[in-house]
A protein has these predicted regions:
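A short, polar/charged loop-to-alpha-helix boundary motif
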Residues: 197-215
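Short, small/polar residue-rich loop motifs at catalytic or cofactor-binding pockets
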Residues: 48-49, 73, 176-178, 202
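Short, positively charged
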Residues: 28-34, 154-164, 213-216
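Structural microenvironment flanking redox-active thiols in thiol-disulfide oxidoreductases
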Residues: 90-143
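Long amphipathic N-terminal alpha/beta scaffold segment
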Residues: 32-73
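Thiol/selenol-based redox catalytic cores and closely related redox-interacting motifs
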Residues: 135-201
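Short active-site neighborhood of thiol/selenol oxidoreductases, capturing the structured segment around
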Residues: 65-90, 94
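N-terminal targeting signals for export/organelle localization
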Residues: 1-49
């Protein structure tokens, strides 16, 4: 059975076959610059007290982290948007583990800066069984240390391939989160934290699930 990273690597391989080298170079430059910024070193580390949050789900209902943590450990997954095939593949991998999450008493939310309508499209199209929350302008992602601003040259590239981030997000900041995952204990402490400047690299869901399970 293929791992999540195997599936993501397949997306990368197909992209390299189909996309012109000069276009690929734009994305590579962005990844290199984001890594060089040191953002991976600034993510909220294990042992920290996680920021509390109250965000709307895809139907406009307010979801509070405190209410979920009262029921057990919480997995928080930050993702860029429904336009990102890597994010879609990762969330679908988590969908397949939803039964295991429930059996182990672990809750999960996915969080993006997309509008509620865009999140609702994603929930419906990919049959996501967990709440998908909106983080306007990546305000919460900033508190977790995983928010960044898309550089001008990458904005032009995105728009050229019909990825209109301001439209999808409903605001003009061009802020996105790193693809990040956190596990938070019922006491509000970070048990697991991983984020990568390279959006093509993601931890296996089982790693985060193991951290959540050990907290129960």
């Amino acid at each position: 059975m293929s791992t999540l990273q195997d599936q993501l690597d397949e997306i990368t391989a197909r992209t390299r076959e189909l996309v012109q080298a000069e276009r690929l170079a734009v994305g590579e430059r962005a990844v290199e610059e984001l890594f060089a910024s040191g953002i991976e070193e600034r993510i909220l580390p294990v042992g920290s007290l996680a920021p509390e949050f109250a965000l709307n789900d895809s139907r406009g209902r307010l979801v509070r982290s405190a209410d979920m943590l009262a029921l057990g450990p919480l997995i928080v997954k930050f993702f860029r948007g429904r336009w990102c095939p890597y994010c879609v593949t990762e969330l679908e991998a988590w969908r397949e583990l939803h039964g295991t999450l429930r059996e182990r008493g672990v809750l999960m939310v996915a969080i993006s800066p997309q509008t509620e309508q865009q999140n609702d499209f994603m929930v419906s199209q990919h049959a996501l069984p967990f709440a998908v929350l909106r983080d306007p302008g990546c305000a919460l992602a900033e508190k977790f240390g995983v928010a960044y601003t898309v550089p001008e040259y990458l904005r032009e590239y995105y728009l050229s391939i019909l990825i209109n981030v301001p439209f999808v997000n409903g605001e003009a900041s061009w802020r996105l989160p790193l693809p990040a995952i956190y596990v938070i204990s019922p006491a509000g402490r970070v048990l697991f934290a991983e984020a990568h400047a390279d959006f093509r690299v993601r931890p296996e869901p089982e790693e985060a699930l193991a951290a959540a399970t050990h907290s129960t």
